[in-house]
Amino acid sequence: MNNRMLSFPSMLFLLAFGIVLSVSAGTTHADELANQTAKVADEASIVVSTSQAAVEQTQSQEKEISPAMEEDTSNLSLKPNAQQESQSPDSSTELQDPAEQTPPETSDASAPATTSADSVEKYAQDATQNQSSTSNGPGVIRATSAQVTATRSVVSSQSGDAIVDLSADKASYRQGEDVNLSVDFKNTTDKEQDVTVYADVYYIDNKLGTYKFSKHLKAGEGYKMQSGDLKIPASQFENNHGYLLKVRVRDADNNTLSEVNKAIAVESDWTKFPRYGIVGGSQDTNNSLLSKDADRYRAEIEKMKNMNINSYFFYDVYKTATNPFPSDEATFKQDWNTWSGSEIDTQAVKDIVNQVHDGGAVAMLYNMILAENTNTGEAPVLPETEYAYNSDDRGYGAQGQPMSYTVKIPKDGQEEDVEIQRYYNPTSKLWQDYIADKMGQAMKNGGFDGWQGDTIGDNEVYSYADKDSNDPSKKFWLTEGYAEFLRAIKEKLPNYYLTVNDVNGEQIYRLKDGNQDVIYNEIWPFGPALPSEMAAVKPNTVTSRPVLTKVRQGDWKISIVGAYMEGSENGGSKADAEAGKSLQTDAVLLTSASIAAAGGYHMSLAALANQQDETDGGQGIGVLQTAYYPTQSLKTSSELTRKNNDYQQFITAYENVLRDGVENDDAQVNTFDSNGQKLSTDAKGITGNQVWTYGKKGDNFRTVQLLNLMGINSDWKNEDGSAANKTPDEQTNLTVKYALGDVSMEDAQRMANQTYVTSPDDWSKSNLQKVSASVKTDENGKPVLVINVPKLTLWDVVYISNANQESAPEADQAQTPAAQSSDDKVAENETSQPAAEDAKEQTSEPAQDQAAPAEQGQAINQAESPATEPEAEVTPATAEPAKVDAPEANQAADQAVSPEPASQEQAASQSQPEANQTPASNETPATQGNSEQPELNEPTAQTQPSSQVSPANTSVTPVAEQPTNQGQAADKADQAPTNSTSTPESTSPVEPAATDQSSDTPIVTAGNLSVQPAETETPTVPDKQGDSKANQSSTETPVADQVPAVAEQPQATEPNQAKPSVDKAAAPEALSLIQLKQQTPAIQAKEADDPEVDETKSEVTPDSGTDKAPEAGQVDSDKAPTVKPSTPENNDNQPNNANDADKNKTNEADSNKANQDSTKGSSADQSGKSTTPEDGPDNSSPEDPETKPSDPNTDTSDQEQVKPSLPVVPNQTVDDPKTDDTDTPANTDSAKSKKVADADKNKVATDSEGRQKSSEFPKEATDLEKVGQPASPQVAGVKSSVATSPEKKSEPVSKTSTTSSSDKLPKTGDHKTVVLIIVLGLVFVGMTGLLARHEKK
């Protein structure tokens, strides 16, 4: 026996030997996986070295950089290296699939243009001082004594400094594109804890949803979000709409550390709401645009992107008027520019164009429409018969000679007249053919999307045949030929945008039939653009209003207005320039406000790489001062840039209120101070020292525009400079009286209950606040709306919804999908505190009717109650006192509690325009009418548990928010049905908890997204097809019939309580079993094991005057609408019944795999990461939140039943039915579940890439010779440049490398691991034999 067995010491030796080999092999294999991750990581990431050597190198470089360059460097943003992320032993988060992670604008490494957010490594290293010597994971920044953080945007915080930078990946999104937010934030507290970023989505007065992302940070530690960390699905938005995102950072105790508002616009055609910026030469380099300034331009364009500029005017980057942008010259000199000798680097221009495209904007090449240069030595391109000839000698040359333009050029101490341009007849066929050909080539060479035409102004001329005639009947105005010219150019260049400058709008009516894509006017303080009443007064801020009125009366397109501030030619502005002063902030803002209030857009912001725009904190963002754009005599201050950013966010967020078919209202509107003194003297704003007041009306709403001119004059150009004060006296407690005319008293009372005020100024920062309003009568018995306005700094907009509440009672009965678990003690890094904890902040806020500018007006009274499921919690709804007088509230409540399926579905139909029907990217969401589908009964609660797919220590949570009512959207809001009630087996009782004002709905994590479906109401376009698909999917849901009837009760609404029609845009909301089964096997199996959740009642305080919150167990699943999250799987439009059996098998077969993987999640939690999908059950024990007192400021209208909902997959597609392939029986084998999951994720990445190709603009921008050649002038139909790179499709393998650290250990089935095990086994057997032989001897 002794000869056959080893001795005890030998056995111990073998055991130790085996352990050493196994650990070494495991480490080797994990390192190999980490290396693979580094190879396939997001190409948009910039290497950020954290070594001391890199810091020293950076510091030495900074000493050599000029002050202007240093300023620019600080404006660049950085993304940490993916390799650093994967190899960091204590990485606090895991990588996402690069295919899902990389936003369109940064996904193509081969694209010739790069943005400031992820471009030059040299400048990226300047931020290494923000990082510790040892990385704590991607994006983690250690606070230092002299921390410098690169920024991509102009951050204008309402409170706190926890938000360092806030950026979106595009200035304007095409329909069907996801919104990727990037928030750089830090833990400003003195303790280590979870810090959470919340993003609330609003459309006017309707809260559509809340999304959130959590990170565990040490005291003073910062985090730079990675691409895909915080994503809002395309289904949340409707085409041609502006939205307001309220971004907040909170600590684990739910204390708000910082708040910032940002606008998002979804526009398939930029000409619907143009926001025009300028790119021009730098005054620092003789008005040249050179490659050496490329970094400054990148940083400026990046900031303007985040100011939502969706179109750019490339000024004076042409060689000559008749050869604008040659393809064979790397650099050309502008010989016609004799006063500065400027040069243009063509590649620098192309790079900027590509960056513009990457940001979702278009690039317009500037050139004269009739000119040729005469001082360049070039011969005339056409015979003299094609010129326009002067009918007199008033400014354009001698009578009978070709019309020309002359400038004075300094020479030998004197000024010499030099002719630089001559003009052709716009009706000349030869000229039309010639210039169309040349401009077509130029736009193709530079990648431009259109032609910004310019004119020298109007003039009476003769044709060549009549040039010597004195017959008045033979002469004509140049503008009379513009329409013919423009039509001819559009016929020859149909795929390019076209607009022309009609100076001062003098002959705008003649251009009505010119077929131009957008109206552009350069306004001057003289000429017929001024109303006759101004003859005796100085020109003022309203010079654009007559032009805009003409545009609206002619039913034309939106107008862009060029109005140049101050200048330095003479007067006080010249003295200011010589003294090195800055532009007057309020003078610029009032001009922009007056134009926006009238329905236009002030073209003023410019990227000019000019030191004047940097030295006073302007961050490189210039403001146009003269007709020659590179001239920047006055500085732009940090205050002006910050406030310009606020105004751009406001104009974008409320674009539908300001200029979406809005007309002037001739009704009498007056403003009075608190003493009853009338402050509004004339509606045309001709005189100063008044509150310029006038009304406007749109589709189911009205507005009152209030512009403060108290104590100042009305000279908009401000040629007197700082000598003329432009800061008006701030007004408080104003009363606005609005005569409603023939409106009935009932309608007038309804409007009074739906009255709000907002402003871009600091007191409001775009937050919509409900204000008190009452109805009185005039001497004729007609109703007069009396409105209290709390404050007026420069510009206020009073918004009055006149939508009929009776038509949309569903607003008060929407359900809130399941919320995210608040059990942060169990899972420290799980998606952080949900709405229940948010209530702490809200309970201390004033009532909605107060004059506070914060979220009171928008996120009023919303609540939810927690669920026992992981990531789920809902708090009880609180009432909104302001809604007590709503005449239709009770009626809406009665309808809400009824078991009518129509009401149930309409209540939720306003959420997520497209997510629920999964239409193609160009399809519109379903209508409210379609939402009345009684068969939509998918049991969504049981699908929730597995929705946690967030990487360790991070999570993004679309929080289910109940939308509030709104005026205009009420009739237009057509959405897919929202989530239905939970099934019995997926519910369990929970305690209610108060919710936060802005993040008051449940949350469900998904990937690094937590779906907190919005109880929203995004107005949408009818889509019968989408509804039918949703119905089909819901009726085929297996467990749907088991759901007990639950009658949903009405709820108090957000700012538009009285008008509940359009509240239901439930962003990523609860899913059906079918949708659940379309997820990866691991997730499906996990869902089967999740604990059940029961929804508790959310009650509204009786004295709130609002309807009751919905009660659990009262909504019949057959009548309750459901909402599908925006995952590729849920976007399948194919029938689901054929695959139900297979999907059930998949759930059962993969349960074992899910249980095995669950151990990985717990490991991740121990390392300080957010809960992974497998962690769901472990965290299902909810942290019973305290029941907090109801806050009258809490959103109650958005209250819905607890419904777990499946997460939104990053970069989800909206219309790819091929994702159903993952449901085939072949994929149900538990042994293959991991491969199936990986395959699903890879397929999602590939499908999302294909989806983006069809929705992005510009067309094939990666090829320089193809950039700027859109298939049509409609942006929606043109492909994107960067996001559609073919190389991207080769990245599916990267999904393997993005797993958590626990997945990096050797895995059974890996061929290298198998070989390693075999070798170790052989070594072990050999050693055993040797020891046995030795002991035998």
Swiss-Prot record:
Its lineage opens with: Bacteria, Bacillati, Bacillota, Bacilli, Lactobacillales
Residue spans with biased composition (Polar residues)? 74-95, 126-137, 806-821, 916-968, 995-1019, 1028-1037, 1050-1059, 1152-1174
- What residue ranges constitute the propeptide? 1309-1337
**What is the designated name of this protein?**
Dextranase
The top EC class is hydrolase
Gene symbol of the encoding locus: dex
Pfam families according to UniProt: Glyco_hydro_66 (PF13199), Gram_pos_anchor (PF00746)
What's in the keyword line of the UniProt record?
A: Cell wall, Glycosidase, Hydrolase, Peptidoglycan-anchor, Plasmid, Repeat, Secreted, Signal
Question: Where does it localize?
Answer: Secreted, Cell wall
Describe its membrane topology: Peptidoglycan-anchor
Q: How does it assemble?
A: Homodimer.
Renumbered to this chain, the signal peptide range is: 1-30
| Catalysed conversion reaction | Endohydrolysis of (1->6)-alpha-D-glucosidic linkages in dextran
